[in-house]
């Protein structure tokens, strides 16, 4: 009895899945296999394929002509829509005309069921070519391409549901996808838009060290000899430096000179030699020229005491009073020694000593060491250990120097002296003015500073009738008499009175009995005033050496 295979067509799908289902091929071996027992309790499995008796080849009826035409039309529409979406693949397929023309030539000679099988194989070959040509090899490569036709997917899904799966057979390995190729997605430009504005930032400059001419390393040299003399005696001290300075280095002198030869800046990306930082060199002294502060060898001079006071008023005048350093050369000058007509090759300066060409060369560039900030102060720094009871100072003055005396008191207070003045102790002084003045006059440990001015001379030597209305002048006259009595009682020797000439005062304004002592000027002699209050001498005598050896020559 002949059987016919009914075909169900699902019109809801875009492509009928049942029409794309390939017809199973039957072999004589399958006819000899007995049918598997049909057990009701057995769970349905994908491997249990033969649940119904297989169709014999003798009982097989060909598919109707209408179904075959419908299948061919669906396949043609699927291929046409696929090549419209992927036109580049159509060119690749056309190039392989030798391999693709053979199945097409055989379609007319084969039966309809075999023609469909060859068409399905061709579609599978197109799918493998599409997977190999796909440029997406990233983490989303396992996802299906939305542009693929649904006919292929429906054909495979329908085939797995309605027909048994073939057994895996050993065969040639399928064509694998191309290996991962670096694309723009793996670089710094993978972001479509620069959110943080990184591309607009300037590229960083090379790391350099900010140093000045005085901070450059140099060889150890003597401060008592000219550098040119030491270069002749010790030629190994000369440092070989690169010939071309870097125009971008902040220590380069030409970087700050608008008219210099290196005024133009090198664009970013050019190489900068690492040794360009040490290109800043100075010219050695010419023969016969001695650096400032340099002296010939001989006995050491008498050492001088240098004070380090920290007065606010002294900040403006300290460079002129205490700065004994060498005059520094300006940073915008670059010196080179005379070449004497012979110039060394530039590339030889960067080579090691054993690879440099031998022969007469120009003297190499040498960096002159930075002179000390205070070369004359070669003694040992020490702090004065003046006891607290010897730091008391009392000042007597007239009203014409009141404002200047306040600055002078501030100078003494900053330097550690307990200075007493009637302006700062007016409340205590108001209890008993005479007793307040005598407390400082009778204490022999208190140093008394006399502020000399034209008004002071008038107050101490004028008639008392002229001071009736000036109470401060009367107190100044009383203090002057007490000091004069002490001076006479000490045998006309001055132990603690320090006359200081304030502005607009001359030495003729000093009282007669004080002219036989040291008279200082403010603010010119502030250092000497501090030394006098510290009971220290300005110059310290050198240590005593041994007696000379005498050579006795007999007659």
Curated annotation (Swiss-Prot):
Residues 166-176 have a biased composition (Basic residues). Residues 1-46, 82-189, 308-380 are annotated as: Disordered. Keywords: Inflammatory response, Transferase, Ubl conjugation pathway. One of its GO terms (molecular function) is signaling receptor binding. The keyword ATP-binding does not apply. It catalyses: S-ubiquitinyl-[E2 ubiquitin-conjugating enzyme]-L-cysteine + [acceptor protein]-L-lysine = [E2 ubiquitin-conjugating enzyme]-L-cysteine + N(6)-ubiquitinyl-[acceptor protein]-L-lysine. GO terms for cellular component: cytoplasmic vesicle; nucleus. Disulfide bonds: none annotated. Residues 112-123 have a biased composition (Basic and acidic residues). One of its GO terms (biological process) is positive regulation of defense response to virus by host. Its EC number is 2.3.2.27. Residues 390-531 form the SEFIR domain. The keyword Repeat does not apply. PROSITE patterns: SEFIR. Interacts with IKBKG/NF-kappa B essential modulator, with CHUK/IKK-alpha and with IKBKB/IKK-beta. Interacts with TRAF6; this interaction is direct. Interacts with IL17RA and IL17RC. Interacts with IL17RB. E3 ubiquitin ligase that catalyzes 'Lys63'-linked polyubiquitination of target protein, enhancing protein-protein interaction and cell signaling. Transfers ubiquitin from E2 ubiquitin-conjugating enzyme UBE2V1-UBE2N to substrate protein. Essential adapter molecule in IL17A-mediated signaling. Upon IL17A stimulation, interacts with IL17RA and IL17RC receptor chains through SEFIR domains and catalyzes 'Lys63'-linked polyubiquitination of TRAF6, leading to TRAF6-mediated activation of NF-kappa-B and MAPkinase pathways. This is E3 ubiquitin ligase TRAF3IP2.
